């Protein structure tokens, strides 16, 4: 049976260029070889709440009444969890002002960077099936990732109906994005 590699993807930012639009756009991939069992790692944090950096930092639901000390502990626990996992990650970072409000240039650069990453690391992925876990938070990102992977010739599949609360590695991608 072919090796299966999971790719959990989280993004941070938006595609706007004016007003209150974000200055940066980040896309983080977290890779896990499914032949390596991480159930013991996951069991250690099974009683922890779902990690989502934005609501924890901004004290949004469900963290409205959670003290700063408790929220700090959540970050510490996801940090330790992440450090002990047999995973690899890659974050792509874009300073949007470098694209002079040209969304097409930004999309082209993202597609090219993701394609180049997979092509440059072909030996890691060529004998594997890549299962892509993305919640379709931004449809443009789904299209960019699909376009980049399609031209690599790698065997990949997008998992359907992905919800971050169901996957701790998706939450790790969110944490890494926040940390970067």
Model-identified regions with their sequence ranges:
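Phosphate-ester processing/binding pockets and catalytic centers
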Residues: 1-180
């Amino acid at each position: 049976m072919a090796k299966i590699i999971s790719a959990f993807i989280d993004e941070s930012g938006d595609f706007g260029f004016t007003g209150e639009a974000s200055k940066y756009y980040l896309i983080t991939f977290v890779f896990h070889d499914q032949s390596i069992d991480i159930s013991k790692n996951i069991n250690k944090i099974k009683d922890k709440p779902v990690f989502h950096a934005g609501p924890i930092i901004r004290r949004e639901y469900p963290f409205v009444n959670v003290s700063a000390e408790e929220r700090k502990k959540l970050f510490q626990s996801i940090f330790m969890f992440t450090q002990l996992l047999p995973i690899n990650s890659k974050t792509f970072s874009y300073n949007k002002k470098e694209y002079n409000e040209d969304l097409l240039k930004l999309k082209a650069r993202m597609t090219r960077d993701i394609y180049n990453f997979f092509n440059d690391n072909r030996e890691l992925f060529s004998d594997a099936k890549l299962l892509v876990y993305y919640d379709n938070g931004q449809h443009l990102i789904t299209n960019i990732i699909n376009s980049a992977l399609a031209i690599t010739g790698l065997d990949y599949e997008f998992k359907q109906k992905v919800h971050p609360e169901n996957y701790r590695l998706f939450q790790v991608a969110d944490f890494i994005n926040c940390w970067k």
